[in-house]
């Protein structure tokens, strides 16, 4: 906002110097108010970035000259504009008020502004501080992440704003009040569990505007766990269904065995159907030879598990507890059985 650049004639620079010497506060001299009531003290002005700021100076008929300065730079002297900034305009120049406006305010406009007046006796000044508030904005946040259960995870969320925003992390995939909250730019999770997967929300808030909110998804991989495998009783000639339900990330692949034989759709009138985390083995016309123990095997890249399920006829005495266990196995998962054995533990 300087005035003694190449765009101005040398005589204008002389005028500026004269103004500073005659009635404006020289650079380096402390600001003083003259008397306690004139010019009237001004409150600080607070505006949001992009808004307009109005700086008002209350004067009276004792004033012979008046000017607005930003630090040591003259913006206006009377009705004469000295600032080259098109955003700075004069609003009011009357015997009782001298006001300017700064349009589309930005953070570099923040700072002290001085209304300097000349009376018959001596110069007097009044200072106002312009405060520019900036809504919160998240500038950098972690990408979605996939980890194995038991690993450590660190999420980052960096935000800017004026005043400096408060950054809060919250786990969205749990009931309200049950998920942990971290008031920090970094969210650190040690020995992560499968129930800590889901969306995490970063919120940046400074009360200037609505909070800026971004989300990060954490996927936790874990080996299969068979959560449901129920023995089924059915009469000869009826339809029988064995069901096996497994939880796993990535999703488990299923195989069915009877003793050492891997079963497949179409074999002896059976059908295997896999839908998501559930696999079913259907017998459309149960015969005596179909009765017995079947093994459901669920696998993914992290591990393998199995459960024993029994198809039985009327009057059979069956242990009500199904055998579900982790297991080791040598299998061709997408082809024919190469070798098959289980070690339960």
Swiss-Prot record:
Superkingdom per UniProt: Eukaryota
Compartments where found: Cell membrane
Domain Ig-like C2-type: 39-126, 136-219, 223-310
SUPFAM superfamilies, alphabetized: Immunoglobulin
Annotated keywords: Cell adhesion, Cell membrane, Disulfide bond, Glycoprotein, GPI-anchor, Immunoglobulin domain, Lipoprotein, Membrane, Repeat, Signal
Residues bearing carbohydrate: 44, 70, 140, 285, 293, 306
Residue stretch(es) of the prosequence: 323-345
Disulfide bond annotation, renumbered to this chain: 57-115, 157-202, 244-296
Lipid linkage positions (GPI-anchor amidated asparagine): 322
Role of this protein: Binds opioids in the presence of acidic lipids; probably involved in cell contact.
Homology family: Belongs to the immunoglobulin superfamily. IgLON family.
Cellular compartments per GO CC: plasma membrane; side of membrane
Biological process (GO), any one: cell adhesion
Pfam families attached to this UniProt entry: I-set, ig, Ig_3
Record keyword Glycoprotein present: yes
Chain's gene name: OPCML
Signal sequence range: 1-27
Membrane topology: Lipid-anchor; GPI-anchor
Keyword set includes Glycoprotein: yes
Entry protein name: Opioid-binding protein/cell adhesion molecule
């Amino acid at each position: 906002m300087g005035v003694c650049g190449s765009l101005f004639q040398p005589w204008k620079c002389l005028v500026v110097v004269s103004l500073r010497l005659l009635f404006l506060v020289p650079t380096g001299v402390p600001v003083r108010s003259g008397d306690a009531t004139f010019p009237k003290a001004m409150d600080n002005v607070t505006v949001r970035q992009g808004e307009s700021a109005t700086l008002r100076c209350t004067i009276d008929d004792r004033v012979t000259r008046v000017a607005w300065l930003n630090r040591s730079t003259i913006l206006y002297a009377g009705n004469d504009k000295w600032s080259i900034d098109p955003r700075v305009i004069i609003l009011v120049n009357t015997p009782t008020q001298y006001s300017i406006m700064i349009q589309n305010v930005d953070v570099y406009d923040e700072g002290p502004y001085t209304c300097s007046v000349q009376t018959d006796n001596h110069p007097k000044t009044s200072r106002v501080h312009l405060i520019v508030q900036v809504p919160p904005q998240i500038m950098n946040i972690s990408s979605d992440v996939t980890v194995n259960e038991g690993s450590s995870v660190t999420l980052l969320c960096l935000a800017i704003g004026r005043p400096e925003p408060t950054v809060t992390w919250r786990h969205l995939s749990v009931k309200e009040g049950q998920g942990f909250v971290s008031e920090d730019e970094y969210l650190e999770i040690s020995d992560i569990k499968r129930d800590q997967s889901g969306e995490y929300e970063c919120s940046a808030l400074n009360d200037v505007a609505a909070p800026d909110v971004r989300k990060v998804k954490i996927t936790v991989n874990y080996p299969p766990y068979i959560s449901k495998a129920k023995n089924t009783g059915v009469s000869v000639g009826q339809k029988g269904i064995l069901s096996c339900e497994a939880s796993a990330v990535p999703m488990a692949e299923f195989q069915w065995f009877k003793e050492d034989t891997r079963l497949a759709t179409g074999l002896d009138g059976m059908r295997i159907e896999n839908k998501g985390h559930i696999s079913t083995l259907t017998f459309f016309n149960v015969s005596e030879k179909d009765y017995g123990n079947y093994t459901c095997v669920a696998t993914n890249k992290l591990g393998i598990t199995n459960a024993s399920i029994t198809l039985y006829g009327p009057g059979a005495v069956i242990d009500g507890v199904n055998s579900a266990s982790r297991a080791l196995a040598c299998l061709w998962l997408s082809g024919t059985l190469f070798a098959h054995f289980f070690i339960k533990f």
